[in-house]
């Protein structure tokens, strides 16, 4: 029987997890090197490549010195915490990757805490030691202190540290002596990470992840914790609430390199994919046919935020997308629930609306962006934070926020955060930059990143993670400016936009199609202003021919999806179609809006 090591790679966002896995793949000669250099093999979803972040957990295996190493790449963002937790169930040890300059960041702490609670043995990899001003030795001390504070035991604190640069493709036990390969890291994995315990008995496997194939449907992925599975075997599927279904394994696959290989039998401790099981959910157990014993299901963090999803009912409905009806929207959200653990969906107040609960703006905006690329048209409301009543008191989610800014912008960063009910808990200079740590309500994070980047000339590094529920902190002021709202449907005309430049900043370019009720700009004052930017210049013979002035308009402000979601107010929606994104009022008719606001004033 082949020796196996199961290992998960955990780290803060963008410290180089996926690049490191790529290096391991090259080391094991799974890919011819020159052709794919420079692009990540594992982040194979368009969105992941564009944003440079890992969203979905992935499995790969490499053979080194005759030992099979199963590598699981995990996402670093706490918004995808649901992914991290279920993946750690499959691993025996973790590779903790830390940036040699940035050190331990909030997300490092978030993922490490989960691994330590599960009793996993860590190996610390200090990456990017080729960067100027890096401080590998200090970072190693930081990691030790962090593990100690998180309550690690002696076995976990006695960790091995490997230094290197995944990008340049070397690892070494001493950062001052570069090598020419990452072999030292692979040797450390073999010596430090325990082989999975072989437990004889009836089969048991916890389904920790799932894949989808257009040919065979849903495939269950997990690690066999006891016994062995054989292709064609009859098994029991143990679901929640003690429901047991009798089923049959049609096909078994193990991970080999970047793909999968069919096998007849999988031994205890290996990670495998099972085909032919219907109606399973993540957290179910595959157990013996006659005496089923279920494993405890996976506990996932609760959602902290909700958003209204509804079909697109604007005047431009159906011009852009393929899937536009509420039936399409409902089916797509149900399909997403199958694999997205931290998501919940409930029907909204009307038949064509749904309330979607998630872990944060990033988590939900990745879903919206994926749907947009698939050809969906939909509208999304302002994100709402979920409150809880604890002991008769209204409580809201609080996050730990860390901001790293150059010294001259510290005052601005503190002011922006405290205005949003943030409390400064720690401040530490790091070279010419300063690290600020706050406790801040989740509500206060909306729109915070764009404000901080503007105030710090794009230099701020922002990260946050959920901490706990605390008593409600009071109202937070939202943006003060009203909107410029179009009252006509047609094309935006430069002539009339030029006349309204002193009233605010525009979100649309001349020539763009707009409709009545669309938000076309930000007003300089507090109230909304209804404007007509579809008016053309009257061409009569009275005017002198040469008196036309050249119109110079400032460029329009373009939002990303997250920025738009954080920008809108309660009476606005973001309309998302495959080729456009617009902000609109919920009530398109100006008279209906006026009646509504008069009623609220009364």
Language-model regions, residue ranges each:
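Canonical P-loop GTPase G-domain recognition
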Residues: 121, 131-191
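Short boundary/loop segments of OB/S1/cold-shock single-stranded nucleic-acid-binding domains
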Residues: 195, 206-214, 391
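Structural beta-sheet core signal
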Residues: 96, 124-125, 163, 356
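Conserved short loop/turn motifs at secondary-structure junctions
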Residues: 8-9, 126-133, 174-177, 209, ...
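Signal for well-folded cores of large energy- and translation-related assemblies
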Residues: 25-29, 63, 85-92, 99, ...
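Amphipathic helical hotspot of TIR/SEFIR-family domains
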Residues: 103-119, 140
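P-loop NTPase switch module centered on the Walker A-proximal segment
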Residues: 1-98, 102, 142, 210-213
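Accessory interaction regions appended to the cores of large information-processing enzymes
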Residues: 140, 160, 184-191, 220-602
């Amino acid at each position: 029987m082949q020796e196996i090591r199961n290992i998960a790679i955990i780290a803060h966002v963008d410290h180089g997890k996926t690049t490191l896995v790529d290096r391991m793949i090259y080391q094991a000669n799974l890919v011819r090197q020159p052709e794919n250099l420079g692009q990540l093999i594992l982040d194979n979803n368009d969105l992941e490549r564009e944003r440079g972040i890992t969203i979905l957990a992935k499995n790969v295996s490499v053979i080194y010195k005759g030992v099979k190493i199963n590598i699981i790449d995990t996402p670093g963002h706490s918004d995808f915490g649901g992914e991290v937790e279920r993946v750690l169930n499959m691993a025996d040890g973790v590779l903790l990757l830390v940036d040699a300059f940035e050190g331990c960041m909030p997300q490092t702490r978030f993922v490490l805490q989960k691994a330590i609670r599960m009793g996993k043995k860590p190996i610390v990899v200090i990456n990017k030691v080729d960067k100027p001003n890096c401080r590998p030795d200090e970072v190693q001390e930081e990691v030790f202190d962090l593990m100690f504070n998180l309550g690690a035991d002696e076995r976990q604190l006695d960790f091995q540290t490997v230094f290197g640069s995944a990008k340049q493709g070397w690892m070494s036990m001493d950062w001052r002596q570069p090598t020419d390969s990452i072999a030292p890291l692979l040797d450390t994995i073999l010596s430090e990470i325990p082989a999975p315990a072989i437990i004889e008995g009836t089969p048991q496997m916890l389904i920790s992840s799932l894949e989808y194939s257009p040919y065979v449907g849903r495939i269950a992925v997990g690690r066999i914790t006891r016994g062995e599975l054989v292709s064609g075997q009859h098994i029991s599927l143990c679901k929640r609430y003690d429901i047991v279904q009798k089923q049959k394994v049609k096909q078994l696959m193990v991970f080999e390199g970047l793909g999968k290989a069919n096998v007849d039998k999988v031994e205890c401790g290996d990670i495998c994919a099972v085909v032919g099981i219907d109606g399973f959910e993540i957290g179910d157990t595959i157990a013996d046919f006659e005496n089923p014993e279920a494993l405890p299901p996976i506990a996932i963090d609760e959602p902290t935020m909700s958003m209204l999803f509804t079909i697109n009912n604007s005047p431009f409905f159906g011009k852009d997308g393929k899937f536009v009806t509420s039936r399409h929207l409902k089916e797509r959200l149900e399909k997403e629930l199958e694999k997205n653990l931290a998501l919940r969906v409930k029907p909204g107040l009307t038949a064509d609306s749904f309330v979607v609960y998630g872990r944060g703006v990033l988590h939900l905006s990745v879903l919206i962006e994926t749907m947009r690329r698939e050809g969906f048209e939909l509208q999304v409301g302002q994100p709402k934070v979920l409150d809880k009543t604890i002991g008769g008191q209204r409580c809201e989610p609080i996050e730990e926020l860390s901001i790293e800014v150059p010294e001259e912008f510290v005052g601005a960063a503190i002011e922006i955060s405290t205005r949003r009910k943030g409390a400064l808990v720690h401040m530490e200079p790091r070279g010419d930059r300063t690290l600020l740590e706050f406790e801040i309500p989740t509500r206060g994070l909306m729109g915070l990143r764009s404000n901080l980047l503007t105030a710090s000339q794009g230099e701020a590094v922002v990260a946050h993670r959920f901490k706990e529920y605390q008593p409600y902190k009071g109202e937070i002021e939202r943006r003060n400016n009203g909107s410029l709202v179009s009252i006509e449907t047609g094309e935006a005309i430069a002539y009339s936009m030029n006349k309204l430049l002193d009233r605010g900043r525009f979100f649309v370019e001349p020539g763009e199609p707009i409709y009545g009720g669309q938000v076309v700009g930000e007003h300089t004052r507090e109230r909304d202003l209804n404007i007509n930017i579809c008016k053309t210049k009257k061409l009569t013979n009275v005017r002198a021919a040469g008196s036309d002035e050249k119109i110079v308009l400032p460029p329009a402000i373009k939002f990303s999806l997250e920025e738009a979601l954080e920008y809108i107010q309660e009476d606005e929606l973001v309309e998302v179609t495959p080729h456009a994104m617009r902000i609109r009022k919920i009530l398109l008719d100006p008279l209906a809006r006026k009646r509504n606001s008069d009623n609220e004033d009364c």
